């Protein structure tokens, strides 16, 4: 009875625990366990081994993406968050009488570095999985006088934007997970997060950024604050970042940085963008949370430049940007996705593309960065930190 009360307490606090949190007796019994032929199954919309971590309008948008598709999916003017991630739900079948189950979930076939969940039922919801990633799992059923262990099974998450839920903060997601155009690499996940202003976050939300996502750098592109809402333990980079590729003499776009005839703020915005980009050259700065106010314009510009530099293709770059319109802040100024995608964001893409129209977008972005003063060593550093082979 005491053991059941202890497990109930653990489950009430948090289902995800480390191996050290499991009672020693259970570990000893699990080590002696023999394989048994009961079959865990995955419950998903299509009842397949592919799990969608999005649902509703955002799932329809991301699964069938084409430019300015958001306005065709969203049929109202409500400024609400529509892209909360959907947990994966694992279920399994076992003989009656189990006291509790231990579920191990890992990205590794041998279940090393596994997340461990304890549950009294034959199902478990798992939050915050990575996009486009294969996972392995095993269920261990603990009975009064025996331990029954399943074989190792697997499932894969769909290649859809990895949105995250941070209480109080809108427009939050992982900027990684996307493949390069040649499919040889992808952007590491859990390295760069993007979203809206942090000060909107509850204490629980800010604690989640610090403790769950491990944020080490708050890259604030508004130049309005003197300290991070996340506290003194994070590296605070605060600049007034340029956005898009402005027209006329606005001087606010990245096209003004390399052309002395554009706008009075050329030097200021150039220095700001250099500091933004150089934040990504230091491995000690990661994970980074990048934001402006809405998490769409200044944030969208720097995320475009970093991911384009690393080789992400046009479709994924546009989809990541347009995902903002499924958030409360992304629509806070009543702009439509169609207008913003086809005018300022398309202008940003076109401007960078012109640096090397016959080469890849990654090469064109590299040439732009070299033009404004980023060095080749700094470019190489960003790529080495953010890219992983596939």
Summary of predicted features, one role per range:
Residues 1-30:
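Gram-positive Sec-dependent secretion signals
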Residues 27-289, 302-390:
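Cys-dependent protein tyrosine phosphatase-like superfamily
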Residues 294, 298-299:
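Ser/Thr-glycine-rich phosphate-binding loops at phosphate-binding pockets of nucleotides
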């Amino acid at each position: 009875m005491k053991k059941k009360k202890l497990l109930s307490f653990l489950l009430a606090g948090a289902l995800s625990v480390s191996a050290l949190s499991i009672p020693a007796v259970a570990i000893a019994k699990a080590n002696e366990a023999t394989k048994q032929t009961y079959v865990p199954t995955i419950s998903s919309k299509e009842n397949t081994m592919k799990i969608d971590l999005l649902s509703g309008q955002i799932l329809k948008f991301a699964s069938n993406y084409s430019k300015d598709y958001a306005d065709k999916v969203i049929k109202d003017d409500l400024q609400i968050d529509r892209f909360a991630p959907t947990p994966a739900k694992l279920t399994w079948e076992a003989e009656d009488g189990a006291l509790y189950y231990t579920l191990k979930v890992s990205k590794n076939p041998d279940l090393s570095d596994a997340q461990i969940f304890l549950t009294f039922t034959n199902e478990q919801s798992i939050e915050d999985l990575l996009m486009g990633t294969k996972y392995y799992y095993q269920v261990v059923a603990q009975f009064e006088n025996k331990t029954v262990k399943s074989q190792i099974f697997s499932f894969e998450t769909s290649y859809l934007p990895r949105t995250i839920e941070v209480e109080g903060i809108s427009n939050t997601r992982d900027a990684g997970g996307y493949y390069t155009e040649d499919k040889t690499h992808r952007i590491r996940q859990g390295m760069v997060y993007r979203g809206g202003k942090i000060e909107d976050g509850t204490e629980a939300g800010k604690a989640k950024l610090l403790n769950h996502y491990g944020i080490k750098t708050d890259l604030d592109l508004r130049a309005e604050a003197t300290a991070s809402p996340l506290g003194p333990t994070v590296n605070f980079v605060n600049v007034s970042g340029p956005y898009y590729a402005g027209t006329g003499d606005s001087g606010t776009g990245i096209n003004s940085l390399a052309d002395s005839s554009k706008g009075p703020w050329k030097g200021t915005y150039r220095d700001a963008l250099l500091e933004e980009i150089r934040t990504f050259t230091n491995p000690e700065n990661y994970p980074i949370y990048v934001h402006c106010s809405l998490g769409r314009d200044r944030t969208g510009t720097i995320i475009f430049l970093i991911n384009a530099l690393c080789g992400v293709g046009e479709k994924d770059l546009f989809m990541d940007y347009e995902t903002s319109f499924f958030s409360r802040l992304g629509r806070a100024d009543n702009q439509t996705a169609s207008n913003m995608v086809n005018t300022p964001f398309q202008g940003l893409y076109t401007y960078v593309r012109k640096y090397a129209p016959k080469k890849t977008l990654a090469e064109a972005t590299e040439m732009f960065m070299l033009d404004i003063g980023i060095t080749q060593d700094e470019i190489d550093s960003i790529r080495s930190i953010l890219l992983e082979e596939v």
